[in-house]
């Protein structure tokens, strides 16, 4: 019988405030990442987090992201899993710099819903990722105030 070896991956979490670090945000992110990893056949071997870090903060100023890069360069893990693109960044430039830094190291960035943020084989995918990166920071504050809701949610 052949034993299937799981591909190793690391998780990256980001919370925008210290209270989110202790609260639901990290729990929710971990659960989504763990569920996706199990379903997709990845073995999570480490976790990196930036707590109380704005999604607009530059990648190079994030301690958790720096540790993630060190780990990648040191052990050959080539998959980073995040809950969604907003956990990486909420500014387009920050998002794209993070993705390019990981692509340069031969790393794929996957979201917990299976999107490959590093897949640049289809220009339309790249365009949609970049549009989402521009739009999310405008939508999120409005959604927090209850002004904008997805059509499928009544309240």
For each of these PLM feature ranges, what is it?
Residues 1-150:
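Short, structured surface patches at the beginning of a domain
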Residues 153-155:
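Charged, gly/pro-enriched flexible loop segments at helix/strand junctions
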């Amino acid at each position: 019988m052949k034993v299937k070896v799981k591909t190793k991956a690391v998780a990256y979490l980001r919370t925008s405030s210290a209270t989110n670090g202790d609260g639901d945000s990290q729990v929710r992110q971990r659960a989504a990442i763990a569920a996706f990893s199990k379903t997709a056949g990845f073995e999570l071997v480490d976790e990196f987090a930036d707590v109380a870090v704005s999604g607009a903060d530059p990648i190079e100023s994030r301690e958790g992201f720096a540790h993630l890069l060190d780990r990648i360069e040191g052990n050959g893990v080539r998959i980073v899993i995040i809950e969604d693109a907003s956990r990486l960044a909420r500014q387009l430039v920050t998002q794209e710099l993070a993705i390019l830094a990981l692509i340069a190291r031969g790393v794929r960035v996957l979201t917990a819903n299976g999107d490959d943020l590093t897949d640049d084989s289809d220009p339309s995918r790249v365009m949609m990722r970049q549009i989402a990166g521009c739009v999310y920071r405008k939508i999120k504050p409005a959604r927090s105030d209850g002004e904008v809701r997805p059509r499928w949610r009544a309240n």
